[in-house]
Amino acid sequence: VEAGAVLGDLCRDAEAGWYSPQTRQWLQTVSGESLEASGLQEDTQGTHPLAQQVVMLRHSRRFGEGSGIGQLARWVNQQQPAQARKLLAARSHDDVFCLSLKNEQDRALERLLLEGHGEGPQGYRYYLSLLRNQRPPLDCPLEDPRWTDWARQVLQAFDAFQLLCAVRKGPWGVEGLNQRVTDALLKARLIDSDQQWYEGRPVLMTRNDYGLGLMNGDIGIALKLPEREGPEAGKLVLRVAFPRNDGQGGVRFVLPSRLNDVETVYAMTVHKSQGSEFAHTALILPDALNPVLTKELIYTGITRAKDWFTLIEPRAGVFEEAVRRRVKRLSGLMLELKEGID
């Protein structure tokens, strides 16, 4: 919920509870659970009427009890930076990693982004290797289902890893890191060009295109496919593969010339990643505190990770400062409701 949004303002007392004795009694009766040891605040003065209509779900089933990702997310959400740091430093969970960079040119960053962590958490080499190794024979016509199957596998492999940034500008922002990853992939010969369009380029839709049926936030990958007809029939040309999101695993292919509102997406902002999840997610923080750095942003970045999470820190202390800060939400609706009640 964004800062100033209505839902966040209406539910701002949900964490503390503030149930009246009557509400508490009703909850205990219908649930069979005692609230005595819940730690929830009690509204004995009738000053929180809206809280009687709000319930907060407190148990996440997304991460298991022993999940380092789940525990780290809880410490961040509770604004406990010391506990979060202790978990990161202990290295006792095989799903949470931390990389402290020595300086801006530290090549450990490139190694992580390309290779990941050993056998499990992947980097960008994974999807590009699959792209090359699983490509159908070049004499297969475009109608052959092997092309669609291959494109689907590449798209799924790309979801194995995503780099998230807090900011857009600077060496630790989306723009600088997209260029840095592109340079590293070119040097490793995992891509064959750094021009605007090349095979393997992942792109993010930045605006809805109803004519193409593509929405803001959709991710596609440029692939070489055989031309179907005309003087260049059979020749490999670039098309961008997008998942159809139809529940059937379908893939649509779009010519790059038809895509006007796209950007390279080796790195994306945490804001753009909301609603998505990736097997291995890496969150890189800037080297100085920034107004957007809050516990909400850190929490969102952590919870985009399905199986593994890596925190990348160019400078010590920024993570702790961010966790101590929270978004101030104020839509004005609560003030109006309070005046109406009074």
Each language-model region and where it sits:
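Conserved helicase motor core of P-loop NTPases
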Residues: 1-203, 209-212
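Short glycine-/acidic-enriched loop or helix-start segments at secondary-structure transitions
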Residues: 2, 175, 214-215, 293, ...
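A general structural-boundary detector
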Residues: 44, 60, 187-190, 207, ...
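C-terminal accessory regions
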Residues: 78, 218-342
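Short hydrophobic-aromatic micro-motifs
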Residues: 163, 204-205, 283, 311
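Flexible, glycine/threonine-enriched loop-and-boundary segments that flank and lead into catalytic domains
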Residues: 206-219, 223
